[in-house]
Amino acid sequence: MEPILIPSQHNRLVIPSEPNEEEFNYIADGYKGKLNIDSYDIISTIGSGSYGEVCIVREKSTKQVYAMKKIYYTEVSDTELVKKRALRERDAMVICNNKNNKRAPKLYCSFIDDNEGVFYYVMEFIAGGDFNSYCYKRLVDGKKFTEEEIKFYIAELVLCLEAFHSYGLLHRDVKPENLMINKDGHLVLGDFGSSKLANNSGGGGGNFGNTLTVPMSTSYSTSPSSSISSSLLGGSGGFTPSHWNGMAGSAGSSFGSSSLGRSFDNTPPNFNSFLRNPHSSYTSYIGTPQYMAVEVVQGVNYSKLCDFWSLGAILFELVTGQALFVESPDTTEQKIRENIGNWRGLLNTAVQKNQPMSKQAESLIRECIAPERKRPDASTIKKHPFFEGINWEEMANFNVEPPFKPTLSSDDDISYFTN
């Protein structure tokens, strides 16, 4: 695999040890804005967390609207760790920029204010909100997804992951909240704060190839007994709007929930336990618990295929309206991990309980919620019978009409983040 270099990093790979102003500052080709907060008028704050917020802003000279993500890195106990994570997210976004990836939000610039202790990202404003809130609204309105609609959205997720993985990146936090809906109704994969650059792109069975092994030194949970409401939970399972969990719409999710400190039960997470050891390769404990692959939970080597486990969990929820590994709003993170560890029996029970579902959907769920060595990658998934009738070339070129297209009144319309 060729080393992936970014414009501001001439002689190194992504993820340096201690980012500073010189290496954090970035500006995309053709962007006319300046690298300072005074160049932007804040229109609205659409989300906030314990150490960050997301605003909609208008750049003063061009009058263009953007999403601005702010991370207050002095608000946490391990400042350098936050800096590393912030730069990792920035680097993943720049890689997507360089590849002209239309399935990721474009990063226009990033800069740091060391005096105030703030990281800034100026990004494309994805105005349709997050996929989780859209799913919840549909369920509230009694509009269950048809299999054709599910097929469309899962196919778009496959394409999002295929592109991301082709750059040698793992996402590691694939969930409905981190999928955005653009103005045309297509899915965009966001929040790269948990992303990881792989060692190389070789390997069989869809794996990247070599993976590093380090001791498990962290736990995702804020505490073993902490109560967690699934981001897709309503009653005994199902979709819940993102802004019910401490953030408005997708502001705390698709534009970067992890790096804003949002927790599922409105309790700020233990930042050190959440982010410790962010650069240790494939055994670091990163991701949203109910979507984490079993190999991640168990702390063994993992690859890009961990993202397809998450895809399988999302597919199950779209088909059934139920969260696969979350039994109730009182389910603890520790219990979720236990459920994932016992996934074979739980999956069989859940599938039987939620019949009828098509054989094709059940088959794809079972292929994704499976041991890593048997799990398909994007090229294999695209051949699955579930996607019969899908024209992948047309999908890749955004030529297939989405089931839903946002109705927007202006370039700064934030209605999908407040309703």
Curated annotation (Swiss-Prot):
UniProt record, GO biological process: intracellular signal transduction
Residue span(s) of domain AGC-kinase C-terminal: 388-419
Catalyzed reactions per annotation: L-seryl-[protein] + ATP = O-phospho-L-seryl-[protein] + ADP + H(+); L-threonyl-[protein] + ATP = O-phospho-L-threonyl-[protein] + ADP + H(+)
Record's keyword terms, sorted: ATP-binding, Kinase, Nucleotide-binding, Serine/threonine-protein kinase, Transferase
Active site: 173 (proton acceptor)
InterPro entries: AGC-kinase_C (IPR000961), Kinase-like_dom_sf (IPR011009), Prot_kinase_dom (IPR000719), Protein_kinase_ATP_BS (IPR017441), Ser/Thr_kinase_AS (IPR008271), Ser_Thr_kinase_AGC (IPR050236)
One GO MF term: protein serine kinase activity
Binding site for ATP: 46-54, 69
Protein kinase domain span: 40-387
EC number(s) from the headed UniProt entry: 2.7.11.1
Main enzyme class: transferase
Pfam family, one: Pkinase
Similarity section: Belongs to the protein kinase superfamily. AGC Ser/Thr protein kinase family.
Protein name according to UniProt: Probable serine/threonine-protein kinase DDB_G0290859
Organism: Dictyostelium discoideum
Lineage, uppermost ranks: Eukaryota, Amoebozoa, Evosea, Eumycetozoa, Dictyostelia
